[in-house]
C-alpha cells in the first residue's frame, strides 16, 4: 500500500498536542475588527481544541501526526 499524503492545508492550520488532542486557531480574527469588542478580540487570540466529533476527520487529513 502506498504512503498516505498529509493534507498540507490542514498541517499548516492544526497542531497535535503531546496528549494527542488537536489544537486550532479561531476564526473571525483577520478583518472587520473595528465592530468587534475588545473582549471578543481578546478571546479570539487563544487557540481552541478541535471537537472530539471531528477527530476522525482530522486524523485522515494528518495521518502521521494524529
Swiss-Prot record:
GO biological process: translation
Family matches, as NCBIfam families: rpmI_bact (TIGR00001)
GO-annotated cellular components: cytosolic large ribosomal subunit
Keywords: Ribonucleoprotein, Ribosomal protein
Gene responsible for this protein: rpmI
Family: Belongs to the bacterial ribosomal protein bL35 family.
Top-level taxon in the UniProt lineage: Bacteria
Membrane-spanning ranges: none
Keyword hit for Ribonucleoprotein: yes
A GO molecular-function annotation: structural constituent of ribosome
Protein name per UniProt: Large ribosomal subunit protein bL35
Origin species: Moorella thermoacetica (strain ATCC 39073 / JCM 9320)
Amino acid at each position: 500500500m502506498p504512503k498516505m499524503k498529509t493534507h498540507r492545508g490542514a498541517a499548516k492550520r492544526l497542531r497535535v498536542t503531546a496528549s494527542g488532542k488537536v489544537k486550532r486557531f479561531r476564526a473571525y480574527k483577520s478583518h472587520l475588527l473595528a465592530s468587534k469588542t475588545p473582549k471578543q478580540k481578546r478571546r479570539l487570540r487563544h487557540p481552541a481544541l478541535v471537537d472530539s466529533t471531528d477527530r476522525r476527520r482530522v486524523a485522515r487529513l494528518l495521518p502521521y501526526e494524529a
